[in-house]
């Protein structure tokens, strides 16, 4: 009986403690007709500078408003296990401990608006698995880190408005799993609609927020903006421009293209999947299975120029587990695009007949090969195989031969001396059999499409006679490897107008070894291939153009050429070319001898006329300036006998002399004598 009484007292005490309310707060209990209820606590004392610690443990909603609290300490609410709504608004909170919200497993709503937060502990959202509303409005947050994105998937309402954000992570809008299809049978707890508040921030409008800009231009039922009328603050040309009217430069969503969407291949064969993507900035390409799981195959990825990227994934010795869909995903700051390639494995196992150096017919299993894309694989320049080309400074090609159970490949890259360029892949989708030719010509076409042309005895076969299956057989036979043989000291021993003879030293070779000679006009697109016997250690290349420059590489049969196995040479010029230059020089010299004196004579005449023109105009002006008079005084004709018309010239001379001079120096010998004038 005594123990029972003590137990009642303890329970009463604990119940009283659970109902205690801090002096600076008000606690209300709202009951319901069914006997249940919830406790609401409001703390708004302006003198409160610390969080209260003796809150009722059954508190469901806690509001701490308009206080001077500056910090939320670690595990500040850990004992409020029933707390569902936490409002710490319009205080002076500047920092939050990462473990401040520990044990709040029932919390649905967290509002921290109107504080001075410069950062938020995003990882603390893991302590609140049921949180749906996060309000960070009107703080001083400057950025959202990339690490925060994985914690946002369960939020249905996120308000980051009126902060100091200038940008967001490019994948910000991909934080919610509803944007990606959810596999059937998987429980998705993420909300079906997201409400975002992003207005009133000094946004820098570039590719990083291009998805958000595009979102403001369309109506998306899954994502709702609290205020779609957001404006750009930077760069200067977009200052004050609404998102709906902003046009971003150098920002283009990726576009993906595959060479084939369906591939059928025999069991145990090798398959290449190719994917090409364009966009700005240059997109990155990844390969996944249909369930988004990563692939475990060899992938080569290269960007021949800005805004373009290709990728090839190699499936060697495929089996039934390799059948299915493969996704090629291209992604950049502006968005993501994907394409799907379906691989079907046929249950027929065949063994190809290995080719040899003589011409014969061989059978190959049917292979469908498709270039593709994947993760990037870097290749050092020291191990790159080189070949001269004129495609572009940033392009090259590589050819892959497929023969089960392994895939051999080599790269032919354009170079000058020792310059190594980036790699572009020669993609082939071929199967069946063909006859081996002694001389082959590989033609690479622009635009990403590449064909294989075969020449035999110096003449090319018509396109219709060479099927894709034959092309693969020829390409396969060029890749038979003799790993121990090596070519050294390649040199030119003789040159003519239309041919050249090459010689070399060969080490670690067998008696029946063969070598492959690859040559092309320097900078040309046609690549010619011929076989030679290594026992002679020399080969003569005929059919060259006089005065032309060529590049040639000599390597063991099936082994790609290396840098030290290539040489550049020129054929002799035709003598007629020199005579033409001499004739042109003589004609030019003769023309100069004839024309130069004529030009000098014309210049002399022009200068002479220029010098004579000035006195001529002065004489003309003098004639028009002076007036002729018959008499100087208005007397009768009888009185002025001395100034008769017969003396008109003398009157003119008199006008040129001063009056005083005339009167002092004129004398008359007689009445009828001629007067003399002195000036």
Curated annotation (Swiss-Prot):
* Annotated ranges, domain LRRCT: 201-253
According to its record, how does it sit in the membrane? Single-pass type I membrane protein
Disulfide feature: 275-328
| Tissue specificity | Detected in the outer plexiform layer (OPL) of the retina where it localizes to ON-bipolar cells (at protein level).
Annotated keywords: Cell projection, Congenital stationary night blindness, Disease variant, Disulfide bond, Endoplasmic reticulum, Glycoprotein, Immunoglobulin domain, Leucine-rich repeat, Membrane, Repeat, Sensory transduction, Signal, Transmembrane, Transmembrane helix, Vision
Q: In which domain of life is the source organism classified?
A: Eukaryota
Result when mutating residue 494 to T: In one non-syndromic craniosynostosis patient; uncertain significance
Per the entry, what this protein does is: Plays a role in the synapse formation and synaptic transmission between cone photoreceptor cells and retinal bipolar cells. Required for normal transmission of a light-evoked stimulus from the cone photoreceptor cells to the ON-bipolar cells and ON-ganglion cells in the inner retina. Required in retinal ON-bipolar cells for normal localization of the cation channel TRPM1 at dendrite tips. Seems to play a specific role in synaptic contacts made by ON-bipolar cells with cone photoreceptor pedicles. May also have a role in cone synapse formation.
| Protein name per the record | Leucine-rich repeat, immunoglobulin-like domain and transmembrane domain-containing protein 3
Q: What is the lineage of its organism?
A: Eukaryota, Metazoa, Chordata, Craniata, Vertebrata
